[in-house]
Amino acid sequence: MSDNEGSVPTEGIDYGDTMVVWPSTGRIPGGDVKPGGSSGLAPSMPPGWGDYSPQGIALVQSVLFPGIIRRIILDKELEEGDWSGWSVSVHSPWGNEKVSAARTVLENGLRGGLPEPSRPAAVSFARLEPASGNEQKIIRLMVTQQLEQVTDIPASQLPAAGNNVPVKYRLTDLMQNGTQYMAIIGGIPMTVPVVDAVPVPDRSRPGTNIKDVYSAPVSPNLPDLVLSVGQMNTPVRSNPEIQEDGVISETGNYVEAGYTMSSNNHDVIVRFPEGSGVSPLYISAVEILDSNSLSQRQEAENNAKDDFRVKKEQENDEKTVLTKTSEVIISVGDKVGEYLGDKYKALSREIAENINNFQGKTIRSYDDAMSSINKLMANPSLKINATDKEAIVNAWKAFNAEDMGNKFAALGKTFKAADYAIKANNIREKSIEGYQTGNWGPLMLEVESWVISGMASAVALSLFSLTLGSALIAFGLSATVVGFVGVVIAGAIGAFIDDKFVDELNHKIIK
């Protein structure tokens, strides 16, 4: 080596029993490399974005420390043939990382409850500047955590690859006011897939693997990540601040996680082969968005937030009407029970309890409901004379169903009064038809039509039950007639919930 050659500083990476070095001014791993430049390129390997070691893998682009964001770049313009994979060296924990500080804020916040009970809480630890949008470069920010930092599941109990493992925390991206952030989230049940790392073959020595080097898929449709893990258990001697371009480290506030969280990141738990002595790693890979993508993501965030708000209001409205309806059915039970006894009161309370807990459930089909109603009407003990039948019809005709529909609609912010007034009046008219002709099909079909047209089953059951129950309470009929109508109402409502209610009416109440 000449004096000039000896004066050239070098950099390198240790792949176990092989050290690959390169001139520090010739290129930087992961940077803009030109084919044919200075490198440790093996003669049999094509030029590429990071060049290759003699064993046939790309030289390490970056060093991953738990909790510290690193930028990994794949330059497609320089890569020839199949991608060999992202290549990183994994080290032991290094200080000056921001995830721990964000986790502390998150844990303190969770002690006081979630900002929104149905969604995870989040604390950001980095703000991301927009990407340049270079289509020839695939860029991912990667950040790792040790297994015990994200889950209580020990390494020995991790499921097979392809299955998910429950985690307490995830590192993900989210949107706030047009800006992309990296954040730690938690507070609700979450899962992350498990992937298996496999040894990387040594191309310079066929039939052998490179010591302490593995590959694993961490992001769909992208090359596997090549991990050099020989330094994982070696303490870091210095503790400088690491700052990537476009990544501004800062600890945010305790907030509700975004509605499009994780839209541009993938996270996995990487398990290494048994006997490797390497502990599993949690890795999150995040795509940095350019300005146009940021605008689209923020629009999607706003739309998702609006959809969530509307859904939340609808759920609150459903719960309100279910509660109100169950109260009315209990009142019906008390009134009719004065004639039919405690068994009817108990049945009414059971129906009311089912109604109160009907949110998220589906009413029985028209055919099933009609099967139950027909069993009830076939009971020879359920008879009424013409005079009493006329009294029931007249009572229904006098009932202001439209007013009842308006009052029902007033219970919910998302209900339209006109729609419910019409539907309540339809219940009135088809109930009259049922009493006059004995044909209850139109009444039951009316309710099913609401659900088919998009009404939630909980709302449909509530409107149907509330209309029938309110009418009975308003009727000024004799005790005998009230008992008959009470059985019909309990049977009609119960038929949409469970066939057992008609069976109880037939065998325990009708005499």
UniProtKB/Swiss-Prot annotation:
The chain crosses the membrane at residues 455-475, 477-497. Pfam families: Cloacin (PF03515), Colicin (PF01024). This colicin requires TonB for its uptake. GO terms for cellular component: plasma membrane. Keywords: Antibiotic, Antimicrobial, Bacteriocin, Cell membrane, Membrane, Plasmid, TonB box, Transmembrane, Transmembrane helix. Coiled coil: none annotated. It is found in: Cell membrane. The keyword Cell membrane applies. This is Colicin-B. One of its GO terms (molecular function) is pore-forming activity. InterPro entries: Channel_colicin_C, Channel_colicin_C_sf, Pyosin/cloacin_T_dom, Pyosin/cloacin_T_dom_sf. A motif (TonB box) lies at residues 17-24. This colicin is a channel-forming colicin. This class of transmembrane toxins depolarize the cytoplasmic membrane, leading to dissipation of cellular energy. SUPFAM superfamilies: Cloacin translocation domain (SSF69369), Colicin (SSF56837). It is a multi-pass membrane protein. It comes from Escherichia coli. Belongs to the channel forming colicin family. The lineage of its organism: Bacteria, Pseudomonadati, Pseudomonadota, Gammaproteobacteria, Enterobacterales. The keyword rRNA-binding does not apply. GO terms for biological process: defense response to Gram-negative bacterium; killing of cells of another organism.
